[in-house]
Amino acid sequence: ARHTLNTAGQNTTSLRQRIPAGPNRILPPDGVAVGVLAARASLRGAWIAAANEPMKDVVALTPPIPASDWQALQDAQINLLRNDPRGFFALSADTLALDPELRLINVRRLLILLRRLALRRGTTYVFEPNGPVLRRSIQRGFDLLLTELFHRGAFAGATPAQAFRVVTDEGVNPRGSVDAGRLFVELRVAPSLPMRFIAVRLAQSGERLSVVEEL
């Protein structure tokens, strides 16, 4: 049978979990699912989904959900749990995002990672003179960072050139913007599944930093 974990946090089923040297407990599935997600992120990266990963110490799911409800639950972006001979698994890894390009949780987590990295690196550029030398330095730094993520499997593409681009040229930094003290860095990445590029733009204006995602 399949059961569900609502990605909005409203559980429609519970897990019965084995506790060493004690009685089994009935728990909502959220904690176990998040634990699987965290373990995969620690071992392989934030861009790895938790679907099809066995849940430890789970012995049952309750209550049963009729098979006739499965499709409606999937259409509502509710993640299904399944019991098979190998154990208990999450069959999907959806968020409640309305845009299908951002629906998968591993894509969302990859973009969160890139936002954090962009903001962290961006603080080192705040007091640098805004000119070609700075922009070349920024491009080299992000190229190295994204190349490392590419080799770890974060992006699609056979080569780094197919997987991402770091843009700091006049296309995103026109003269008027530079004269106004603004600096833009655009990271265009292809997450490691069939989908189009997503742009993460780091914007600096004076001492203020912001990050915007664009499809």
Language model regions located:
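Structured, hydrophobic secondary-structure cores that serve as assembly/anchoring elements
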Residues: 1-215
